[in-house]
Amino acid sequence: LSKSKQKIIVIGAGIGGLTAAALLAKRGYEVVVYDLALVAGGCASTFKRRGFTFDVGATQVAGLESGGIHDRIFKELEIELPEATYCDPACAVFLPNESEPINVWRDRHKWKLERQKQFPNSEPLWNFLEDLFWRSWRFQSRDPILPPRNFWDAWQLIKALRVDTLATVPYTFSTVGDALRGFGLANDHRLRTFLDLQLKLYSQVNAEETALLYAATALAVSQTPLGLFHLKGSMQVLSDRLIESIERDGGKVLMQHRVSEIKETGKRKKVKVESLRTVETWWDEADHVVANVTVNNFVQLLGEQAPKGYAKRVKNLKPASVAFVVYLGVNRAAIPENCPPHLQFLEAYEHSIAYKPHSLFVSVSKEGDGRAPDGKATIIASEFTDAEVWYGGEDYQELKKKFTERAIAQLSEYFHLNEETIIHVEAATPQTFERYTGRDRGIVGGVGMRVSTFGPFGFANRTPLKNIWLVGDSTHPGEGTAGVSYSALTVVRQIEQSS
């Protein structure tokens, strides 16, 4: 079949699904995207309240720099990259009982001076991480396929290897915890806590468990020549541009359409679609199906057809992260002067209190960035929480109220929050995320970047079922709009090669 005769169904209009769909449509395939939400973008979409625009989950973007993954893909699609400003510092991290933050500066030298001041004796570790990062980054920029599942995948992986990549191989099974011990820093509480806070944002797990090779990249992506970006308008512009590209190239994006089943019937693949507007259901069929869903949802979609070993592996995964998020619309007076765009707060050190201390990751809008009316701002604060808490039968509204009040109290130690400055308050729980994104139990950020689930040991885009593909943060290289865009590009290359 020529491309124009081949049909591809994409399940999920997250950034991974939309990117795959846009690239496939541009390359001549017939593409249709189904998503249950009203607004595209998944965890990188937005909602509006009283003149405020809130980014739902993702608030910063990597890969917009020249040669970055979004830049490469948008060039191929022949669409304009959205306007954005650098996040500098990428994050201001407040450790317990400290009034001055650790600023993760974009400038490499400035960041080096900052970490030498904050963490004396740790420079050998940072230099080691930076060396691993550059080797890994050069490798990733050659588009390897991880983990490989057939000869062609393995050949793409081999072609991406160079002599300088080999130096990273001995560390494939190492964690950041191992590196801290190796450099004699295992008992540096401030450093370990800082790494825990930063890594949890990207890897979903703490320093002790995070795969070293993944961490090297996660910890270096904030600095030049890369960097984290704050999109002008809102996160929604990313999805909007991708949808324009899909529709320009003849593809369709159908929102409020839920896919509940994938069936393999010989060469053709079928998916069961339900229109949430008309409640009609039907089966649509295609040559390929690309599932932009979590691996947990993927197994549910396959039902009885899921290979036993695959389903068992998913069942045995450690529970993924879930988040509780508070969205505040405030007067600018609530924001301290020179407030950085992203902050982290940790209420106490683990050993100092009886329960697990709460940490918040906070994003603050800039004046004139399109997220709030003049003289006003948005504050979005998220914390990791356990799914068990939210699905354990406790009074849901009561729990939501308790979490909201606690988060606002913690934020009030830095921001000026009171009845005069707070205009709008809203919260999202794991159940909210599940309802709007369809992600099983509202999980965020993928399967967690432990050694057992990252890179070579992760879930492949090429699934055990022929021409049924997995894309998104359950696959290499993991979470974030840049991560899922790499995942999408991999799937598109694999589909092209197989067809």
Report the location of each language-model feature.
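A conserved FAD-binding loop/helix module that cradles the flavin
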Residues: 58, 473-496
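Mid-domain catalytic core of redox enzymes
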Residues: 231, 257-373
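A conserved beta-strand/loop element that lines the FAD pocket in flavoprotein oxidoreductases
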Residues: 246-259
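N-terminal glycine-rich phosphate/pyrophosphate-binding loop and immediately adjacent elements
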Residues: 3-141
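C-terminal segments that line or cap access tunnels to active or ligand-binding sites in enzymes
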Residues: 331-434
